[in-house]
Amino acid sequence: MTELSALAGETDTGTRLDRFLSEHIDTLSRSRAKTLIKEGHAREVLGDQVRVQSDPKTPVVAGVTYTVEMPEPIPAIPEPEAIPLDIPYEDEHLIVVNKPAGMAVHPAPGTWQGTLVNALLHHCQGALPGIGGVERPGIVHRIDKNTTGILVVAKTEPAHKGLSDLFAKHDIDRTYVALTRTSPRPSQGTLETDIARSSNDRKKMAVVASGEGRHAITHYKTLETYGQISKTEARPAAAFLQCRLETGRTHQIRVHLAHIGCSLIGDPVYGRHRGIKATGRGEAFDRATDLARRLTRQALHAASLGFVHPMTGDEVFIEAPLPADLAALRRALSAL
């Protein structure tokens, strides 16, 4: 068991103990400090006097040393699984994964195996000092099970804290690409709404009135358009969009694009119809519309991630190419 300590100065007087420890010990997050204090791992040391402190709200006193014991991490509950991973970047602090479609990030009822966490536990065996006292990877964001692309994960407590701070401050550049039914008007802009659970279907999210949900901001730009809806309507049949997240709400891009009438091709939850509505004829037309109709997942890909490394200060930028199914659909749509 490791013991860490910090000496309180005059400017620290009156600060809550959990806040003081998290600010003076880099490896501790505020929530982790609070848990350790409540579990009796924090002590107040003044000369020969040592006293256990179990209240996170205890005000610190100048001249007193505060220590905290760091228990050994307990084994993770999810089982490690030897699942191949596409890893475009890894160092001692972080690992960046290009997640395939069909892989959930976290284990959950009905999906205890085959998740990204299971795969990372196997990949990082013996190299996870513990996040929150548990031997597990530090997941700070997630992408939907059937969305592909880039995800960054912390391997250590300090990196987890640093990444969490970056996401909280919106200092992460997250770019997605999407194939949509028809195209947005205007061709680029910002969607800013509140998002909450749908009152009609608790498994879905929905745009709600201001103040009734969580604030969500999506910036979008149309990169390509394909075909025409009908002979009488000149609007494109489909489009290839770039979307940049300023916030990270559940299903945010899917909900926002469906809200403006441009649902993702293949989206089984927010798409009203399978495939696309288009006019045309010939082999190229048939192939494009057939691929769109047969796509069994939302046409959404986390294409890139940019951030300042929380431990080294280096600029990190990782890209993932469009997966085969979406690349094939994009090529086919280009022939409309």
Language model: regions and residue ranges:
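RNA pseudouridine synthases
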Residues: M1-R202, A234, P321-L336
